Curated annotation (Swiss-Prot):
It comes from Vanderwaltozyma polyspora (strain ATCC 22028 / DSM 70294 / BCRC 21397 / CBS 2163 / NBRC 10782 / NRRL Y-8283 / UCD 57-17). GO terms for cellular component: actin cortical patch. This is Altered inheritance of mitochondria protein 21. Residues 217-234, 351-378, 430-457 have a biased composition (Basic and acidic residues). Residues 1-99, 114-171, 209-400, 414-457, 490-537 are annotated as: Disordered. Belongs to the AIM21 family. Residues 514-527 have a biased composition (Basic residues). The gene is AIM21.
């Protein structure tokens, strides 16, 4: 390849300060023609942000990049002296000092008739204060006047010009005087309206109380006073009559404490009628309902008198409640306008009225209770006859299996009970009796085992016979009898044959039976390196330690006869001397040691035989050959048994 064909790899582009250098770059340019740009200038100090409203943002070349020096930034100037604080109440205090004389002249003009009620005047140094209790009733005209005047004064203070300082000092006192005069007059008229309203409510209360006094019945008052006259010292009417005077006194005291003056002039105001109470309607409805309810008399002579007395009492109590409700309603309007002293008086009046009502109702309730007791005494109550209990349910008869199971349990319980009774101390029973009991138990157990075996065999034969004809066997043909060979096999075995086989099997020894070895994976042997390892036998003349079993415990089931023998041996041993039991002769110990060593050697010889057999291949080959021979013999037997079936099928096919 020539040098012209080799592509030129351009260098990595570098960042430039402006866009002008980017426009001059062309991709086809060679690496030699590229010029490295100059590095940017890094400022030594952090730039300070300038205000956006400055005029030199576009003119200075340095500001275009957003960098400014410390010399161009102008710092704010800190004043040397702290500004003086001006108070807003100084001018008002000056105006108040100049208006005290004018206020005294206004009071003299207003209170010509009663010079004693004039205010004593204020000192020059005192500042007017706001009253503690705000007047509740205020007229719309006075509030609007005071608001407009105060707004005018505020506007005059705010609209201040430096050129009008001399004129402003003259105008302000005049405006402030007018506002104070108007406010003072409005307060005096408000106090007059409050006093007039209170007097009107008091007059209305006196009228309603006087009317109620005429309606109260003398009979009811006599009954109430005779019951508990010591509780009430004065009637409720007198307490209610004293309320208006106490209300007026308290209001006059409040007015004097606030520094305000009350006027005794009266204004005529229309009377406000009382709202009709709902209690009257409810009480009238309740009385009508009580009168309409019929009462069934037991004795006609006595019950009529009781009914007449109760009806009169109910009517009198309803009228009393109506009158007292009217009195409470008339006083409630006055009590709402009063102060804390009025509330206390009202609560006292309510307590007195409730006590009087409770005293009036107590004798009525007692008499009504007596009337109910009289009626209940004369009504006979017949108790209900107790219901007879039905006959007990008849228990269901248990099924045959349950009955047999219950009998079996009862028999077992009886046997256990008899065995417990037979367990008497040996001193009372003889050894011959105990042996007889043991023989009886053995015979019973053997008989039960025989019966169970016979039952199981009989059930099996029945089950096999019931399956005849259901499943097709190899030698069976449809719609024909079974062959003779199958009938012999399927026939029920006789009891004699079963017993003979049992005797034969019982005579065989268990030791002659071949025990099968657990088969493992075939064809797998140990590796040659492991199998060829020679055992090392250390033949040292040093002493050797042998570990063997010194004693052994065998647990076997014990029959009752054996238990009796054991108990007798224990008793005989206890009677013997303790020393003779504990001492063991040397001959016995030697015999035990020799027997234990022989057992240990036998155990070790068996282990070595097993290991040698596993390592030898000849033993495995012999076992394999024996298994193959046994399988061949079994196949021959099966074929010999199937020959009669083949003859039958061949005869059928030929025929």
């Amino acid at each position: 390849m020539s040098e012209e064909d080799i592509p030129i790899i351009p260098s990595r582009p570098k960042k430039r300060a402006t866009d002008s250098s980017l426009s001059s770059y062309t991709p086809n340019a060679s690496a030699d023609n590229l010029i490295s740009p100059s590095p940017p200038i890094i400022p030594t100090s952090r730039p300070l942000s300038r205000a956006k409203t400055t005029d030199n943002i576009n003119t200075d070349p340095v500001t275009t990049t957003g960098i400014a020096t410390k010399e161009e930034v102008e710092l704010p100037k800190v004043p040397t002296n702290r500004p003086t604080r001006r108070t807003t109440t100084q001018e008002l205090n000056d105006l108040i000092d100049n208006t005290n004389h004018e206020l005294e002249e206004i009071e003299a003009m207003v209170f010509k008739d009663d010079p004693n009620k004039m205010s004593t005047g204020t000192n020059d140094d005192d500042i007017p204060h706001v009253p503690g209790n705000r007047p509740k009733i205020t007229s719309k005209t006075t509030t609007t006047i005071t608001k407009e005047s105060l707004n005018d004064s505020d506007a005059a203070i705010n609209n201040k010009n430096p050129s009008d300082e001399q004129t402003d000092s003259k105008v302000r006192p005049e405006v402030f005087k007018e506002n104070l005069n108007e406010a003072k007059i409005a307060k005096t008229y408000d106090i007059m309206d409050m006093n007039n309203d209170i007097k009107e409510f008091v007059d209305n209360g006196n009228k309603t109380l006087s009317e109620n006094e005429d309606t109260v019945s003398t009979e009811h008052l006599d009954k109430v006073t005779t019951s508990d006259a010591s509780r009430v010292d004065e009637p409720p009417d007198t307490t209610l009559m004293k309320e208006p005077n106490t209300i007026l006194d308290s209001e006059e005291v409040l007015a004097s404490n606030d520094g305000q003056v009350s006027i005794n002039e009266k204004e005529i105001t229309p009377t406000i009628p009382n709202r009709p109470s709902r209690k009257k309607e409810e009480q009238s409805e309740s009385t009508s309902n009580v009168e309409s309810t019929p009462v069934i008399p037991v004795r006609p002579a006595k019950v009529k008198e009781i009914q007449s007395e109760s009806s009169t009492r109910l009517e009198s109590s309803s009228s009393d409640e109506q009158e007292k409700a009217n009195m409470v309603d008339s006083v409630s309007a006055v009590a709402e306008r009063s102060t804390n002293s009025k509330d206390q008086i009202y609560t006292n009046s309510e307590r007195a009225s409730k006590e009087s009502l409770s005293e009036a109702k107590e004798p009525e309730i007692e008499k009504n209770d007596n009337q109910v007791h009289i009626e209940t005494k004369h009504i006979p109550v017949i108790p209900e006859r107790p219901k007879k209990n039905g006959p007990p349910p008849i228990p269901k008869k248990p099924s045959s299996r349950i009955a047999a199971f219950q009998k079996m349990i009862q028999e077992q319980q009886a046997q256990s009970f008899n065995s417990l009774a037979s367990d008497v101390p040996t001193s009372e029973r003889t050894i011959s009796e105990i042996e007889k009991d043991g023989d009886k138990l053995k015979t019973e157990q053997t008989m039960e085992e025989k019966n169970q075996i016979n039952r199981s065999n009989a059930e099996r034969t029945k089950f096999a016979s019931s399956l005849n004809g259901l499943f097709a066997l190899p030698g069976m043909a449809p719609l024909q009898n079974l062959p003779a060979a199958l009938t012999k096999k399927l026939s029920q075995p006789s009891e004699s044959g079963f017993n003979d086989s049992k005797e034969v099997n019982g005579g065989e020894n268990i030791s002659n039976i071949r025990q099968k070895r657990a088969r493992g994976p075939r064809g797998r042997k140990l590796p040659s390196k492991v199998a060829a390892v020679e055992k090392v036998n250390d033949s040292n003349n040093s002493n050797e330690i042998e570990v063997f079993r010194a004693w052994r415990i065998d647990s076997k089931p014990v029959t009752p006869s054996e238990e009796i023998v054991i108990t007798q041996n224990q008793l005989s041993d206890k009677q013997s001397v303790i020393s003779s039991e504990d001492i063991i002769t040397e001959s016995e110990t030697d015999k035990q040691i020799t027997s234990s060593t022989e057992e240990f050697h036998k155990y070790t010889e068996q282990e070595t035989d097993i290991t040698d057999r596993n390592q030898d291949v000849t033993a495995e080959v012999l076992e394999h050959d024996i298994e193959v021979q046994i399988e061949k013999e079994m196949e021959e037997q099966i074929l010999a048994e199937d020959e009669p079936y083949e003859e039958v099928f061949s005869a059928e096919t030929i025929g």
